[in-house]
Amino acid sequence: MSAIPPTSNGWLRKMQLGQQYMKTWPIEKQLAPMFPENRIIKATRFGIRFMPPLAIFTLTWQIALGGQLGPAVATALFACSLPMQGLWWLGKRASTPLPAALLKWFHEIRDKFAAAGITMAPVQQTPTYQSLAELLKRAFKQLDRSFLDDI
């Protein structure tokens, strides 16, 4: 695995890990029933794209109509915080070690790569969800869909 996320606890680092995890996770409909990542990633991407303009619109609308500035600022800050919450969740998830059932599945997929004659870098540390995302992305590109049968 190329990028094993460090277990840094800084919130900015979690946001960066979340962005990296969002880019790495394969958005495949077969994974949707088992992992919440598909829904979180779609909602976060939506928030990144539409919440800042919504916040600006809310501020201008409240100010133009002579409304109070306090509630307008609070609404704008809330709208801007939604995509940040998604990135933070994804960053936290990326650095979380895999539970036993997923760890077994992780190694089974690696074994299927070995059986297909595809070399993989050895696992350096305890696999995390980021490691699983990288493995799944590669598996969807290089293996047939039979690796999903074991879920």
From Swiss-Prot:
One of its GO terms (cellular component) is plasma membrane. It is found in: Cell inner membrane. It is a multi-pass membrane protein. Pfam families: DUF412. The chain crosses the membrane at residues 46-65, 69-91. Its main location: membrane. Keywords: Cell inner membrane, Cell membrane, Membrane, Transmembrane, Transmembrane helix. Belongs to the UPF0208 family. This is UPF0208 membrane protein plu3094. The lineage of its organism: Bacteria, Pseudomonadati, Pseudomonadota, Gammaproteobacteria, Enterobacterales.
